[in-house]
Design a protein with these regions (language model features):
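P-loop NTPase catalytic core
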Residues: 153-154, 160-437
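A generic structural signal for well-ordered coil/turn residues at beta-strand boundaries
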Residues: 19, 40, 100, 121-123, ...
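Active-site phosphate-binding and catalytic loops of NTP-dependent enzymes
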Residues: 11, 53-54, 92-96, 111-117, ...
């Protein structure tokens, strides 16, 4: 009787038969198929045997003539010409819920450190989601303390702001993210580790993040050996998880390491689907996907997503395409300087080259005056540093330089901070004021 009812419902809905496709060609990262009927971003199953037991999940990334271009979420071992392809008819979603806190997931939201069935995940969020309407966004008006003196004092971040951390390799980006995750006043951390070395993931979770930070965090991991589609989706999965907590009224800190590797994954996808390479080999989709991702962060009527995105600067060239594009979209940038790291000045933040575009709107007048005075002292000393070091400057020649020499020790003391040091926002402002006593 049940079978009859199911057949009746199937006939009533017009689903008289199911369409399948077949693999026609496998080239590099992409799989070209003839059929089935599909839309962009639909999930498809590529079956590896006639019984249709084993399959590889893939996504529609483009169309070429009468062919569909798929990219797999796993390696393509076992996929060959003639394999049956079935369209699921829906795009990728991620299961979300409060019980995700304290856990790690992969690039498409599958829990990796326990059985997902043991967690009560009450909602499904689409991974590909549009940014909020500009007129529905709340204005950024509140400070979000991150617990690092140099940032809170001189590059103050607001709830809902998006800011980039720009640096070459090995300058301390991951360590700085760990400090933010442990010290921030945000309710929830969502951390995306994209294209990282496999050994660094556990090191970051146990050493940089620690039990204190992990307890209120969700970590999305897609290591460098994963397919380009997984690395690309990891950034969007992390943003979707952050959107879930924002919709619940939480203030979320979304940290992504790194935006550069997201763009590199998009480059692989774009080139494999037939896009032409343009600036430095990046296809046009890289420059359209980045703003789509970054614009999803921000304030809503109930909660906020504050985005911190690391950008790996290729060859320390701060004008290369990805760096330049990210800087133009974000609401500010924190520049890390390798030379400061060589002087054991950590975090190696170049505050003169860094800026928060919302600081003027959220900081008090007194705070802005103190930050301006410190930057003036640092700029004056930096300009005269070579003369001072070779002994060519004589005391009394310039009052501003004399004052900078007097205060530079206190300034550097304020800008440096140990990884285990923690300050409240009020304590940071007091320390900033003491620099000029």
């Amino acid at each position: 009787m049940l079978e009859v009812a199911q057949k009746y419902l199937q006939l009533k809905s017009g689903e008289y038969y199911k369409c399948f496709g077949k693999v026609d060609k496998v080239v590099g990262l992409s799989i070209e198929t003839i059929g089935p009927k599909a839309k962009l971003n639909d999930l498809c199953m590529i079956f590896l045997d006639k019984e249709r037991r084993d399959y590889v999940m893939s996504e529609v990334v483009g169309f070429k003539d009468s062919h569909i271009i798929l990219m797999p979420f796993d390696n393509v071992e076992g996929v060959g010409v003639g394999c049956i392809v079935e369209n699921t008819g829906h795009p990728l979603t991620v299961a979300v819920g409060d019980e995700l806190l304290g856990h790690t997931v992969d690039g498409i939201g599958r829990v990796t450190d326990c059985d997902e069935k043991d967690l009560e995940l009450d909602s499904e969020y689409p991974i590909e989601a549009p940014p909020p309407d500009p007129m529905s966004r709340e204005i950024i008006s509140d400070v979000l303390p991150l617990g690092v003196k140099a940032v809170d004092g001189l590059i103050t971040v607001g709830k809902g702001q998006r800011i980039g951390i720009f640096a070459g390799s090995g300058v301390g980006k991951s360590t700085l993210l760990g400090m933010f995750a442990r010290n921030t006043k945000a309710d929830i951390n969502v951390i995306a580790l994209i294209g990282e070395r496999g050994r660094e993931v556990r090191e970051f979770i146990e050493r940089d993040l620690g039990p204190e930070g992990m307890a209120r965090s969700v970590v999305v991991v897609a290591t460098s050996d994963k397919p380009a589609l997984i690395r690309n989706k990891a950034a969007k999965t992390a943003t979707s998880i952050a959107e879930y907590f924002r919709d619940k009224g939480e203030d979320v800190l979304l940290m992504m390491d790194s935006l550069t590797r997201f763009s590199m994954a998009q480059r692989e996808i774009g080139l494999a689907s037939g896009e032409p390479p343009v600036t430095r080999g990046y296809p046009p989709s890289v420059y359209s996907e980045m703003p789509k991702l970054l614009e999803r962060a921000g304030r809503a009527d109930k909660g906020s997503i504050t985005g911190l995105y690391t950008v790996l600067v290729d060859g320390d060239d701060f004008n290369e395409p990805i760096t330049d594009t990210a800087r133009s979209i974000l609401d500010g940038h924190i520049m890390l300087d390798r030379k400061l790291g060589h002087k054991n000045h950590y975090p190696a933040i170049d505050v003169l080259q860094s800026i928060s575009r919302v600081m003027s709107a959220i900081a008090t007048k007194e705070h802005k005056n103190l930050a301006g005075r410190l930057k003036n002292v640092l700029a004056t000393y930096t300009e005269a540093e070579d003369l001072i070091n070779i002994g060519a400057y004589k005391n009394g020649s310039n009052q501003d330089i004399d004052y900078a020499i007097q205060k530079i020790g206190a300034v550097n003391s304020f800008l440096c901070q140990g990884t285990d040091e923690k300050f409240s926002f009020e304590e940071e402002l007091e320390l900033l004021e003491k620099v000029f006593e």
